[in-house]
Amino acid sequence: MTTSLDGRSVLVTGANGGLGEQFVRQALDRGAAKVYAAARTPRGWDDRRVEPLTLDLTDADSVTRAADAAPDVDLLINNAAIAPAGDHITGPEQELRRVFETNFFGTVRVARAFAPVLAANGGGTLLNILSAAAWVTLPTGYAASKAAAWSATNALRTELRGQGTHVIGLLVGMIDTPMSARWDVPKVSAASVVAQAYDAVADGSFEVLADDQTRYLKSRMSTPAEELYPWLDEQLGSFVP
């Protein structure tokens, strides 16, 4: 058993979801001393090393309280996100703002609140869970919000470098979780994604491409736009009405 997280204090946002639960459990398996399982409505856990923590990404006061309540965190997993059914880039602006408030502003809000905590604990690690949707032509607020979060992750890596914080972006296509159940497409397991994420924490990677589709997509990104985007449209036919 790998023990790459021996003694670390981990905080996972969105800990109630399928991917979040894997982040909590694998952190324990890898030797974490404490795991804050953060969610809007936290649930109980069967391991005393897990500390349920109330955290609503869309509420600045809630995020501040969470940072105050978890002063020993040295590994922050920014995992929480939403992908509403019927989301469309030309849909109601209120819905678009709701997606961005969680997936972009919420992600950045948590990173900013915990940056001083990470600095106080030796720099630590920030891992943002992104999506291959950041690089594709899905006409959704979700894809646009993940593109913004990808850019913010790279900016945070530069911004927090001086305090010794290691910033990782994880990009992946479809994960086999309840959030993706409505799509009948190939999916990678949550366990595999989380294992790759924690391996990246241990080896110092900047970026994790967590499935074959995302790795292939990254290899195509230098293709001229006139070829790349029609190809993407063809690949994504099952997602776009």
Give each language-model segment a name.
Residues 47-60:
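Rossmann-fold cofactor-recognition segment
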Residues 87-97:
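Substrate-binding pocket helix/loop in short-chain dehydrogenase/reductase
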Residues 131:
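Residue(s) in the substrate-gating loop at a strand-loop-helix junction
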Residues 79-85:
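Conserved NAD(P)H cofactor-binding loop of Rossmann-fold oxidoreductase domains
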Residues 186-241:
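C-terminal tail/cap regions
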Residues 16, 20, 24:
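N-terminal Rossmann NAD(P)H-binding glycine-rich loop of SDR-like oxidoreductase domains
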Residues 111, 145-148:
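Active-site helix of classical SDR
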